[in-house]
Curated annotation (Swiss-Prot):
Name of the gene this protein is made from: ispE
Ligand binding (ATP): P94, V95, A96, A97, G98, L99, A100, G101, G102, S103, S104
GO molecular function: 4-(cytidine 5'-diphospho)-2-C-methyl-D-erythritol kinase activity; ATP binding
The protein's name: 4-diphosphocytidyl-2-C-methyl-D-erythritol kinase
Function recorded in the entry: Catalyzes the phosphorylation of the position 2 hydroxy group of 4-diphosphocytidyl-2C-methyl-D-erythritol.
Pathway listed: Isoprenoid biosynthesis; isopentenyl diphosphate biosynthesis via DXP pathway; isopentenyl diphosphate from 1-deoxy-D-xylulose 5-phosphate: step 3/6
EC number, UniProt record: 2.7.1.148
Biological process terms in GO annotation: isopentenyl diphosphate biosynthetic process, methylerythritol 4-phosphate pathway; terpenoid biosynthetic process
Catalytic activity: 4-CDP-2-C-methyl-D-erythritol + ATP = 4-CDP-2-C-methyl-D-erythritol 2-phosphate + ADP + H(+)
Family listed: Belongs to the GHMP kinase family. IspE subfamily.
Record Pfam families: GHMP_kinases_C (PF08544), GHMP_kinases_N (PF00288)
Length: 289
């Protein structure tokens, strides 16, 4: 039997870090939303009791470093499954981009194996499993738009943001999330208005949503990687209504209210950046084709 799941990327409309916790994690408040840039995760049942992961993309790990592998092993062990599964990931989301590609692949494995092995687990139960392997996995199980708190595993769903386009550009650099958090001075940063962002979304107020964009990690990454700042500036110059870095970077996204401006921004960025995408925000997982 074979199951196919889509694994959409996410962007952070608001990302705040409150403090470092005794367990070593950071206490965060994030407004996240899924976009229609998605990997495809194909699950094929194996009679042999093993988990394999493969991809056409050589940068995708095929062992326990891959969150998709961890998700499958966790479900096998937790529910005593003696069968195996082959996982093939068709990567569309850029790797190590601040778009939760690995977390979304893992979430897709949880959803897919729930069907493949007929476990009848609820989405909330799958999200709780997700929290055991990664902070973003819980959100990715559900998708849509949500406020994430704690270390990112506590999810409260909110309204879908007002209608707009999202243009993304990823420079050809890697960013160490651990290093970004290490450099972050929580007591000295200006914290974004997370509640204001939620209000803007619920009011379907595009301009207010643009005004409330914020990411406390952005200034750290911009200092470490000036090319990210260059992409931000160019995206604004080409006409994006608002621009922000997603997660710890290096991907930058621009919100664009009118479709007529999207192609110009896309073409302008493609002049110097290979990985550029024009997409939409989506609601729950079932809104994906």
């Amino acid at each position: 039997m074979r199951i196919l799941e889509k694994a959409p990327a996410k962007i952070n409309l608001s990302l705040d870090v409150r403090h470092k916790r005794p367990d070593g994690y950071h206490e965060v408040e994030m407004v996240m939303t899924t976009i229609d840039l998605a990997d495809r995760v194909e699950l094929t049942e194996l009679a042999e009791d093993k988990v394999t992961v493969s991809s056409h993309n050589r940068f995708v790990p095929d062992d326990q470093r891959n969150l998709a592998y961890q998700a499958a092993m966790l479900m096998k062990e937790r529910y005593g499954i003696k069968k195996g599964v082959s996982i093939f990931i068709t990567k569309v989301i850029p790797v190590a981009a601040g778009l939760a590609g690995g977390s979304s692949d893992a979430a897709a494995v949880f959803r897919g194996l729930n069907r493949l092995w007929d476990l009848k687990l609820s989405m909330n139960e799958l999200a709780e499993l997700g929290a055991e392997i990664g902070s973003d996995v819980s959100f990715c199980v559900h998708g849509g738009t949500a406020l994430a708190t704690g270390r990112g595993e506590k999810i409260r769903h909110i309204e879908t943001p007002p209608h707009c386009w999202v243009v993304l550009a990823k420079p050809t650099i890697g960013v160490s999330t651990a290093e970004v958090y290490k450099q972050l001075k929580v007591d000295e940063i200006e914290h974004p208005d997370v509640q204001g962002m939620i209000a803007a979304i619920e009011e379907k107020n595009f301009q207010k949503m643009c005004d409330k964009l914020g990411n406390v990690l952005e200034s750290v990454t911009l200092n470490m990687h000036p090319e990210v700042a260059m992409i931000k500036n160019q995206m604004k110059r080409f006409g994006a209504d608002a621009v922000l870095m997603s997660g710890s970077g290096p991907t930058v996204f621009g919100l664009v209210q009118y479709e007529s401006k999207v192609q110009r921004i896309y073409n302008g960025l493609r002049g110097f950046c290979d990985q550029v995408y024009a997409v939409r925000m989506i609601g729950e997982q079932n809104e994906l084709d």
